[in-house]
Amino acid sequence: MHRLLVHAEALEREVADLPRDAARHLKVLRPKLGEEIELFDGCGRTRRYRWNAARGVLDAPLPLVCATVRPFPLTLFACVTKGSRWDWTIEKAVELGVARIVPVISDRCIVRLAPGERTAKAERWRRIAEDAARQSDAVWLPEVLEAVDFPVALDLVKTCGRVFAGALTHPPPPPLLAAVSRELPAVRSLGLFVGPEGDFTPAELAALLERAVPTSFGPTILRAETAAVFGLSVLAAACARS
């Protein structure tokens, strides 16, 4: 079934009032007469409408559906990677149910964003998140922040109950699953902090581990986007069991 993201008030109406992007997407879809289209507001509510070809509108809605439980609040702090690899990270994070994505610029990030570029980039990343939510049947849309420098990200770590960081330290830290299992169900929100391809600088790692729990992601070195998906999968599975 095709899905469109709309403003919350659109779901209250008998004839759907679509925002410009959703209306454009609907036109591309070319729905058939009577075809059901699901609208969602990104805040846990969905409603199905039928395409009225004669009037060119979505009407005859079914009852409004509200998600009864919000997913466990997960935050991904991830150093920005190049091009499509970062887009893929956002997409998979949405599919795995994160509540917030914090793009981070650390000393060894290949991607460098001037302050004036960050707003436009964040808008693009939010569109990627919206597309991922629409395609994955997600009903909650995560908050996607503008890219922040590493010191700012450290301050944001304080907003999570507990944050876990992949750390290449000696001796190796405990596996991520074991570390998470020790914290649940006591904490109310979790975060994952993933470094850049070149890893954190020693100073960054020391500062991060004053605020985050060091963990191991396994015996091999993972690429940044792989580490993000692996870590979020572990956290999501652990939260689902707790």
Task: State what each model feature region is.
Residues M1-C66:
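N-terminal positively charged helical leader segments and presequences
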Residues V15-D17, P71-T75, R188-L190, L208-F217:
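Glycine/charged-rich beta-loop-alpha catalytic/anionic-binding loops adjacent to active sites
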Residues K32, T46, V69-P73, L96, ...:
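Short connector loops at helix/strand junctions that flank enzyme active sites
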Residues E36, R85, E197-T201, T220, ...:
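Gly/Ser/Thr-rich beta-alpha loop segments that engage phosphate groups in nucleotides
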Residues A67-A165:
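RNA substrate-binding interface of SAM-dependent RNA methyltransferases
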Residues V163-L205, V213-F217:
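Active-site/ligand-binding-proximal alpha/beta "capping" segment
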Residues P202-S242:
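Structured adenosyl-cofactor binding patch, chiefly the S-adenosyl-L-methionine
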